[in-house]
Amino acid sequence: MIKHFFAAITGNLISLLGTLMMVLSLLFIAALLVMQAMGFEGGAYIGIITFVVLPVIFLAGVAVVPLGIWLHKRRDAKAAAEGRPVGHLPVIDLNQESTRGVLLGFVALAVPIIAIAAGLTYKAVHYMDSTEFCGTACHNVMQPEYTAFQRSPHASVGCAGCHIGPGAQWFVKAKISGSWQLIAVALDLYPRPIPTPVHALRPANGTCEQCHWPTKFIGERLKVRTHYADDEANTELKTALMVRVGGKQAGQSQGIHWHVDPNHTVRYLADPSREKMYEIELTDQLEGSKKVFKLDGETAPQGAEWRTMDCVDCHNRASHIYRSPQFEVDLALAEGRIDRSLPYIKREGVRILTEKEYPSHEEARTGIAAAVKAFYSGNYPDLADSPAVEQAGKALGDAYCWNNFPHMKVTWNLYPDHIGHQDSPGCFRCHDNKHKTETGEKISKKCSTCHNLVAEEESDSKLLQELGVQEPPPAPPATAEEAPAEVATGT
């Protein structure tokens, strides 16, 4: 029986090819598994080859073998009916010089072609994981995200590091999802703007926590933010927070990173935007207890979904940060891209950025520059043609174009950042005193749970000056009465 089985699967060219596909793929899978067991690290691509490519080749071989047997029997039956001899395999006579030449020529061409094809395939897959491909191949669609990414703290991290991460499973999911996205771009089927959050995003423990380990980000950190007042002098103001990053200290979880401690599991039921929480479930793994906090007076609608909380529920714009007009003007002033000596430039900059929407970046830059010049022409004509006014117009134009993309319908504050609660509900999605258990226990809204306010919009804080994060204001010029005698009298 075994003899007949082997004769069947090797008795014709098609079945023989299928058998070779099965045998060789199994041998390669076994070899790669042994290499991995011995500690060989080949990255995601070895996993793809081992668990995706080679199994597909094996299954293809399984399908080819019976197809060959069926075609072979059909051919033999037809040959017998016509009285022709039945041949199983073609005869290759290597004693003939011409046959040897053809065979050697075929092998000589096939080997380099296969090697080149394999190398090109690998490079193609590798290139499709690159930041350049993700950001520029679908330029119109990805321009907003790519622009924001280039200004983010993660600008040196490749897209695949966060959107795919290590391992074969999520690589395959990403490529399947990406195939549909390519079709959507080609047929102009993609939404404008791109909806967020991304519901198919890999959990953060497989991406963020490859670099950021919450249990090691512990203690308190001083966070100082620089603002500028709307007055004529654009007075510099400092706000300082002692942020309770938290983490695990002395066996106890505390602070902000308490939310992702492995001893606690936080789940929530929210609307698709994840901006309105209807139920929040807290499970203490050590005690085995569970609490459910429900939004008072409301029930979840159709489409609400349960989700286990992780990093991106707060750090939702870690790499694609769209900033507010106020933040952009403050940043430009702090970096010196806008001259702080220009009267009322903070107030006017925010006004000019928000008073009008432009149909294109070119019109935005032209219109914003003209609006800046018009203000100073009407109020400070001596400054209207100064380089500082021209530079301010350019900086404000940049700020607008970095955050607004008319062709994708992206405008100011479209994508909220849930870190904090200044420009979006952020923390207050849960910490609002409106979610409570059946016994009446509420989620605290106490500010000191996450931070302590050290200074708030202060221009002359002795404490911040001692910490070295604020310069003392310049001393007023000495009067004649206060000046030394030789200066006052000119002697």
Residue spans for each PLM region:
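Short cysteine-rich clusters marking metal-coordination/redox-active sites
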Residues: 134, 159, 208-211, 311, ...
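Helix-to-catalytic-loop junction in kinase catalytic cores
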Residues: 163, 212-215, 315, 431
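Alpha-helical transmembrane segments and their helix-start/interface "positive-inside/aromatic belt" motifs
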Residues: 5-22, 52, 103-107
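Mixed-charge (acidic/basic) macromolecular-recognition segments
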Residues: 305-380
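Electron-transfer interface patches adjacent to heme c in soluble/periplasmic c-type cytochromes
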Residues: 188-209, 349-364, 368, 477-481
